[in-house]
């Protein structure tokens, strides 16, 4: 089911009693060190992207991260046309949820891609699991999109090892 949780998460409460979630730190052990990497790309990758805009000036353009060479877009739409929140996070065409806290002027999205399964967590609050079919094993590019009107944006990526290679 698209709402399933396949990777372990650590749950906690914010000072305002909001449920927070993040991938468990043990998953970092799957990261491949840079000196061990080759440049062939990977269908198993971890992405940490941060976006910031001027306070009170939410961007009118959709922005976010493109994974699997554009097969899947994970991003934020701040058009303000949503009842739940001025900004909504989305993953592909099938998943959408509010960017919280509501008055924020930044978004951090943590993504783990495991072949066709893509898990995304926005601001340690809103999580989504989506599925995408890459056109080939070489279509692995990761990039930011829609960042021209933002104050700042950054991205970190790590290729990942197999967790259960029996």
Language-model features: locations:
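Beta-rich accessory regions
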Residues: 1-166
């Amino acid at each position: 089911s698209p709402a399933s949780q396949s990777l372990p998460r650590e749950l906690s409460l914010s000072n305002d009693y909001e449920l927070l979630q993040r991938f468990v730190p043990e998953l970092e052990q799957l990261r491949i060190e840079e000196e061990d990497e080759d440049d062939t790309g990977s269908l198993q990758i971890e992405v940490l992207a941060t976006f910031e805009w001027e306070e009170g000036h939410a961007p009118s353009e959709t922005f976010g991260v493109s994974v699997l060479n554009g097969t899947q877009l994970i991003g934020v739409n701040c058009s303000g046309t949503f009842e739940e929140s001025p900004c909504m996070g989305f993953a592909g065409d099938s998943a959408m949820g509010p960017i919280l806290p509501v008055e924020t002027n930044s978004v951090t999205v943590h993504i783990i891609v495991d072949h066709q399964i893509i898990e995304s967590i926005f601001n340690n609050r809103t999580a989504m699991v989506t599925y995408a079919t890459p056109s080939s094993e070489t279509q692995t590019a990761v990039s930011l999109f829609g960042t021209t009107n933002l104050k700042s944006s950054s991205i970190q990526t790590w290729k990942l090892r197999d967790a259960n290679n029996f």
